[in-house]
Structures are given as structure tokens and as C-alpha cells.
Amino acid sequence: SNYVEKGIAKGPFSKSYPHPNENKRFAYTLVEPNTWLNAEILDKYACLKPHSGTHYLASFYSVENSQFIPADNWLISPALPGEAQTISFWANNFNSQGTKYTENFEVLYSTSGIALDDFKSTGKKFEATTGEWKEYTVNLPEGATYFAIHNNTADTYMFMLDDVTYTAGCGKVLGYNVYRDGKLLKRIEPNAEPRITDNAPSG
């Protein structure tokens, strides 16, 4: 995955329960709440439990020079096959004793590379408000080679993603290396005829 990072990431329990990547720059980080928080906290804040399994991805609020920074966190998929497909994922936001920390996010796609300017809107913009995991589905058009989930909440707190499902591509062939006895004989470009001529060693 690829991401854009801005600011120093904090966490919802930064004083008593700092998460493992506290005070580091990241857009999303892998969270395993059972190794970070005790059972009492997880029971009190059930929204912090994974949708399935033991892990999920999360982006936290960030600060720079003691100022909160609006979220601009991108999670970019591996290469896709370029065919029309429907992707799905589960998202959640942090709720605390009736306070809803709403998270805004959108899904974009690229037909070329992974520079942020390459991405176009799918027209799908969402809000996570309930503090419960919810599934989202988005249709990607023919030609889509990447998709991105962009958290762009102005007053972000904690945004969570789990169980992202999509059909992956097989990547782009960059060339072929031909070896004999561990030594490189020739590199063949991807569009060249896959053939080499070589003299066998004597004996």
C-alpha cells in the first residue's frame, strides 16, 4: 500500500494507552488492539475491536507545532487488472460515551499511476458516524488500475478500515533475466523475442 503522511500521529488514549506508533508520521498503521488495550477498555469502547480477525488499519488525528491537522490520508491499493469490478471494505469511526467523532472519506480510482493527481473521483463519498463497523461497496470502471480510500475529515479523530476486498492484477512484466549456473547471461526486454543464442561450455 502507499500513503500520504502529514503531521505527527496521536491516538485516542495517548496519555494512558499510547498506541505502538505514537508520535510517528504515518497515514495508516496496522492496529492489533488486543496487544495495545486491555479487555476493560475494549469492552468500554467496543468500536475499537476489529470487524474480523485481530488486526485492522487505522488513521489517527495528527498535530504539528501543537496544532491539529485536517486529515489527508490516502490508502492506495496494489495494481488492479484494469477490468470493471466492485470493491468492498468495512469502515468505522471512534465513539466515546455518546460523542460521535464523524469521519469523512471517499473512494477514487486511477487508470495510470499512483501519484495523487492520477486519481479521479468515483462519486462515492461517505461518512462513518455510528461507531459500528459498516460495509461499503464501490463500482470501479473498466481501465481502473488502482483505487484509493481517502480520509479527508476536517476534525478527524480515528478512522478504521478492515476486510478490504478486490480483484488484484498480476503486475506489469518489466523484463526477463536468463541465468546459467547462477550467472546472468542476458536480460530480455518485455516486448522482445524470448530467445537467446549462447555457446555451451566445453566438456
Regions found by a protein language model. Give the residues of each.
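Surface-exposed, low-complexity/disordered Ser/Thr/Gly/Pro/Asn-rich loops and linkers
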Residues: P12-L80
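Short strand-edge motifs at loop-to-beta-strand transitions and within beta-strands
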Residues: L75, K134-V138, P194-D198
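Recognizes extended acidic, P/S/T-rich segments that occur
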Residues: T122-T130, K172-S202
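Extended extracellular/luminal ectodomain segments enriched in beta-structured repeat modules
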Residues: P70-D72, L80-W90, G143-Y146
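Extended, low-complexity, turn-rich repeat/linker tracts enriched in Gly/Pro/Ser/Thr and Asp/Glu
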Residues: F68, N92-E103, D155-Y157
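Extracellular carbohydrate recognition and processing domains
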Residues: G113-G143
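Solvent-exposed strand-to-loop "edge" motifs in beta-rich extracellular domains
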Residues: P78-G82, W90-S96, S110, N152
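Extracellular carbohydrate recognition
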Residues: Q67-W74, N152-G169
